Every structure is written in structure tokens, then in C-alpha cells.
């Protein structure tokens, strides 16, 4: 399967359940074209299908699972989409207690990856320094995870009257 965004990932999840198949990989479009030996199945992002999956997560697994999955998408965990799909399959099977099943490999991997993401984001909140370039405050980061969506609200509130950029 190929995916590009979180909605794209949720579209892949819908397709996996609808077709009763487990993909060998879920990859970004550019990566799938280069690494798939036997070809790839391109899954078009379908917002209606993605929304059906998104709405089903808190209903079946609870808000904690929804938050965990949304944050897991920002991690640098290898094959995160497959791990997320494994987590979701388990969650649909066992229900709201899924996040507490830390002995399950799917839950353990996702939980540890999200903890790593949150620790890294927390470090950037405390140690990120800005430099003035004209009227703009600029900070450069080199995160392992995609922490910017996690830390952005903090800096938007902190610098509400300032022009700033984090890259």
C-alpha cells in the first residue's frame, strides 16, 4: 500500500479491512516506487473512508488509543504504519483496554515510539533557542521524529505577537 498523509494512512487501513488483506508494507508514495519489488497497490486518499476509520477508533478503542495513534504517525519508528495497523487490528478485537496491553508487541512498540517522540518534543520545548534576523525570530531543529506539530502550539502561544520560524 502507498500512503502520503495521516488521512492517506487511514484510507489504507480502510482498504486493508475492506479487502481482508494485510499489506507487506505501507509506504510514502515516493518510497514505494523505489522499494517495491513486485509492485505496489496505490491507495488514493479518500476523506470519507478516512473519516469512517477516524470516528471508529474512539468508539471501539477509546480516546487514549486515538491520541496514541495520531502521535505515533509523527514518530520515526521503522515501519510505523504497519505497527499502527497491527495496533488497530488488536484494538478492534479487544476494545477499550488495548492501550493497557503493554505485553502485546504491537502496543509496546507504539507506546515506546510515542514516549520517545514526547521526550524529544519536551526537550525542544525547554532548550530551543531563537536568533533574531531582522524582525523575525528563527530557530533551527534537527529532530529524529516529526516534533514540529507537537511543539508548534507552545511557540505560537509564547510568541503570539512575534514573527517566528522553526525549521
Kindly give the residue locations of the regions a language model identified.
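Short N-terminal binding/cap micro-motifs at the start of the first secondary-structure element
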Residues: 6-12, 16
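Extended, well-ordered protein cores
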Residues: 19-167
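Conserved small/polar residues in nucleotide/adenosyl-binding loops
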Residues: 1-4
Amino acid at each position: 500500500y502507498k500512503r502520503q498523509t495521516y488521512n492517506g494512512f487511514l484510507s489504507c487501513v480502510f482498504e486493508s479491512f475492506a479487502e481482508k488483506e494485510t499489506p507487506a508494507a505501507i509506504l510514502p508514495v515516493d518510497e514505494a516506487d523505489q522499494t517495491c519489488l513486485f509492485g505496489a497497490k496505490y491507495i488514493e486518499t479518500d476523506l470519507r473512508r478516512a473519516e469512517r476509520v477516524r470516528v471508529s477508533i474512539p468508539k471501539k478503542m477509546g480516546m487514549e488509543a486515538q491520541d496514541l495513534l495520531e502521535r505515533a504517525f509523527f514518530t520515526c519508528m521503522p515501519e510505523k504504519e504497519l505497527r499502527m495497523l497491527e495496533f488497530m487490528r488488536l484494538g478492534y478485537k479487544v476494545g477499550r483496554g488495548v492501550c493497557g496491553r503493554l505485553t502485546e508487541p504491537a502496543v509496546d512498540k507504539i507506546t515506546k515510539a510515542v514516549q520517545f517522540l514526547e521526550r524529544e518534543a519536551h526537550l525542544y520545548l525547554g532548550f530551543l533557542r531563537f536568533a533574531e534576523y531582522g524582525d523575525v525570530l528563527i530557530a533551527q531543529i534537527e529532530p529524529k521524529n516529526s516534533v514540529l506539530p507537537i511543539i508548534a502550539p507552545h511557540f505560537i502561544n509564547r510568541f503570539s505577537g512575534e514573527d517566528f520560524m522553526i525549521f
